[in-house]
Amino acid sequence: MKYTEIKEKSVAELNALLKEKKVLLFTLKQKLKTMQLSNPNEIRALKKEIARINTAISASK
């Protein structure tokens, strides 16, 4: 998801999206620990997406 798509959302939508992405990050980290994750780069991409969402939330305040 690009930043332009993220900044169009409301703060409530962003908070819900942030919570969803953090849960997904947690599950990906667990899969990495148990050697079930085929592509570890997914974690890096997800962290960047979480950072974009946090930036959009901070910018809207």
Curated annotation (Swiss-Prot):
GO terms for cellular component: ribonucleoprotein complex; ribosome. The keyword Ribonucleoprotein applies. It comes from the Bacteria. PROSITE patterns: RIBOSOMAL_L29. GO terms for biological process: translation. Pfam families: Ribosomal_L29. Keywords: Ribonucleoprotein, Ribosomal protein. One of its GO terms (molecular function) is structural constituent of ribosome. InterPro entries: Ribosomal_uL29, Ribosomal_uL29_CS, Ribosomal_uL29_sf. NCBIfam families: L29 (TIGR00012). Belongs to the universal ribosomal protein uL29 family. This is Large ribosomal subunit protein uL29. It comes from Campylobacter curvus (strain 525.92). The lineage of its organism: Bacteria, Pseudomonadati, Campylobacterota, Epsilonproteobacteria, Campylobacterales.
